[in-house]
Every structure is written in C-alpha cells, then in structure tokens.
Amino acid sequence: EALDEDDNSLAYSVQLNPQYLLVLADSNIYGKEETTEAPHTHGEIGKVQLKWIEKQFRYAQEHQLRPVLFMHHNLYAHNPAVNKGYVVDDAVELRRLCARYNVKLAFSGHIHAQNIMGPQDMTPTTEIVTSSFCSNDQGYGVVRVHSRHITYVRRNFDMTRYLTDEEKENYTLVHYHKYLKDLQLGSISADMMQSELNQYHEDIELVRAMGNLFGWMNYHFFNGHNHIKASELNKIHASKEYQVLIKHHPEYRLYLKTLYDTSDHSNLQVKIRY
C-alpha cells in the first residue's frame, strides 16, 4: 500500500519496513494526444514532482527512515560519450535533494546497460542501473535489505528448469542465452560491417574481425562484465581491427574508449552502508 501518491504524476512512496522508505519517481514525459511520431524518450521530473519528492525525503528524515530512490531515467551520466536523453533533464535539482537528505541509493534503467556509479561530487548517492532483462544474458538484481546496510548482486536467470518437456525439445529455448547473445552481437555489428563490406569487400576476414570486436566490446559493457586488465585493453587498442575501426569510423573513437574499465570497481555488486 502506498504511503503517499503524487496527484500530478504516477509517483508514489512506500514504507518498506521500520528502516526504509521507497520513493518511486515518475521521470517519463507523456504525450497529450495520439500521434504517429516517435515518443519522447528523454526524462524530466518537473518542479511540482520535485516538491513532492522533497516532501517524501523530509518525511523520511523526520521519521528516521532511509530513503531509496527509484526512477526510469538516470541520475548520473553512466557513459561519458553517450548520455544525452538518458540522464533525467533536471538531474542537478534532484541530485541537490539527494545531497540535502542524504539519499544513499538510487535505482534506474533506460540505458539497458549494467552499471553502478558511486557518490559523485557532493551527492552521496550510489546509482545502480540494471541491464535489460529481455536482452544480453537475462540479468537481474538481487537486493537484500538489512537494518544497517543494503546489498545488491547481479544474477542471470536460467529458465531451462521451468521448461515443459515439450519446450525442452525447442533448441532456442534450451539455449536461450546463446540465442540472445548471438542476436545482440549480430545486431550491434551489422550496420558497421555492411558499410565496411561496401568499401573493403576484398578483405572479408578483417571486416569480420572488426565486427566481432565491435560487438563484443559493446556486449561486455551492456552486461557489466567490462572489467579487464590494462594489458588486455592495450592489446585490443593495438590490434589491426581496432585501429582500422577507429580510422574508418572516428565517431566511435571516444565511445569505444568508455566501454572497458581497468579499475577494481564492480558493476555487478555493491554494498551500501548506513
């Protein structure tokens, strides 16, 4: 049952237990009439809902509750090269509220990539973005709530144990993760490979290597398994397929540099202490 609801949006709050208050914000922008045009995909909280969110945070503060924020769009830029339309438009104002009321944890989505960012500047919030369940490797998060901390661990859903005997005869269903991986890798690299084949059709092996590299770099970023050693990253950057790729597609140069992480940071698990 909702503790409170915003009359001007779909936002609401729920007191989970004696320690935590869940604040579920509505960052979507809705059309006012039917249209054949593409919908707005960027997000905004708006002044009215920001006041409502502050009301929830203040309630949590007054009742010794720890607020946890949920919304579709992102609080932080999880990729320095690609973030326009993903970070909520009024993130500055929302981050200011998170800092004022010591909001330590937020969950969001939209980018379809598994990514965790810790506190930024004066904002104490750790933001967890869980990858899209219907693509990549069917990732989902397991959140355990304790009196003095919250843990998050990314898992993979294995549906084979739930298949009927008839469904187990279906190769795609039994090997569904392979199906999703092949689909994702193919769709990511298809356009780039096609443009390369039009120009360099005499070196199909190089084009195939470029497509394979481009696909895997993206795949690793989107499922959060993008932490590698600096020596491995240097090897990738020195490879012929990488060098030709950024030469022919300079628009990818900065983006590709953001996909791997050589630090000890994890995008798969985190512990928030209170």
What residues fall within each predicted segment?
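His/acidic metal-ligating clusters that form di-metal
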Residues: L21-V23, T36-T126, G186, K229
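Active-site-proximal loop/helix segment associated with metal-binding centers of metalloenzymes
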Residues: N28-K51, Y59-Q61, L65-F70, L75-A77, ...
